[in-house]
Amino acid sequence: MVESIAAGQVGDNKHIEMWKIKRLINKLENCKGNGTSMVSLIIPPKEDINKSGKLLVGELSAAQNIKSRITRQSVITAITSTKEKLKLYRQTPTNGLCIYCGVILMEDGKTEKKINFDFEPFRPINQFMYFCGGKFQTEPLTTLLADDDKFGFIIVDGNGALYATLQGNSREILQKITVELPKKHRKGGQSSVRFARLREEKRHNYLRKVAELAGSNFITNDKPNVTGLVLAGNAGFKNELSETDMLDKRLLPIIVSIVDVSYGGENGLNEAITLSADALTNVKFVAEKKLVSKFFEEISLDTGMIVFGVQDTMKALELGAVETILLFEELEITRYVIKNPVKGDTRTLFLNPTQQKDSKYFKDQASGLDMDVISEDQLAEWLCHNYQNYXAQVEFITDKSQEGYQFVKGFGGIGGFLRYKVDMEEALGDVGDGGDDFDPDTDFI
């Protein structure tokens, strides 16, 4: 049996691509070979693909000298499969090329299975790697899982302001401005009152300028161009900026941290990055909590605009009624399409691991005949490849937050927001079996 991932199947949803890579890494790491029968080849962008072809020719020649006949044949098979995959490409794809080929052992330790993966990563891997051994090498793939959310920083004090972004480990200074604000006037009299008024006016104008530049730096096409915004400084300016109505209202919801720093400018930026690290890490969990909390709110208000459980969610999706699918990233539901060998009709089943072991789900209830399995897919993977066909979006949920844990344990780890109300009893009728049933008396926390 040959498994493959078509090269270049890169979608427009970064989080889905990251989820696919995470699943692929887990699969590859669980593969065990019989001897040195597994080849890992990663070619970075702009690398001459013919160079890798020549390398494989040399490796194939060297493999002929392996003394053990079984090992020799396994290595030759793996390298030959890799060569065949490489021939599919005239040049290295834009983001590089990843190929994994080999013969692996199944769980019984005896049965062998042929594995062939070739794909263009959804973003570049700038590292060449060739390895032939008893396991697949996945370290370069883990670089694809690095978070690339972009965060904005405003460092503001009485001397000036700095605007910057942080993306992964890369930071960029967008703009710097300086200001000379008059110091406080210590003497009394009318002049001190006038001076204080002028000073306050200059401070106000400076704050207005800082707010205006925040909008020009962090808003593009009428929406924020960063995931979160950090305000930092060593005086009251940062707090005033967050509270003033001069700051664009579209930026207020994405302020994730306000921190005190000892310096202005780039030194202040370095300090702000360190002090806001926890807040930036929590951004994803905050977004998840908001999404799932909204889901729970719709349930409590009985709006009829959400769906949960595998059967209801998949039926609503089939009807085109689901706008956003909420999906537990480790959902253990398998989608089967089975066919009656006599009547020719098909059914779709959604089974959890326990149900998959029960033969009753694969028999015709009337005749007792065994049904033919037409297809078998992990439901999460099937959704990731097909969600766009139903004009839906997919949002992954973890069980790391309290809300996420409740969604997974209480609602089966799958649900969705609807475009319009659906009478699920009428829509479902006689549907496939399986999945996790939901009991509102015992499951809702």
UniProtKB/Swiss-Prot annotation:
An annotated GO cellular component: cytoplasm
UniProt keyword Heme, yes or no: no
Species name: Stylonychia mytilus (Ciliate)
PANTHER family: PEPTIDE CHAIN RELEASE FACTOR SUBUNIT 1 (PTHR10113)
Name under which the protein is recorded: Eukaryotic peptide chain release factor subunit 1
Main location: cytoplasm
Family: Belongs to the eukaryotic release factor 1 family.
Quaternary organization: Heterodimer of two subunits, one of which binds GTP.
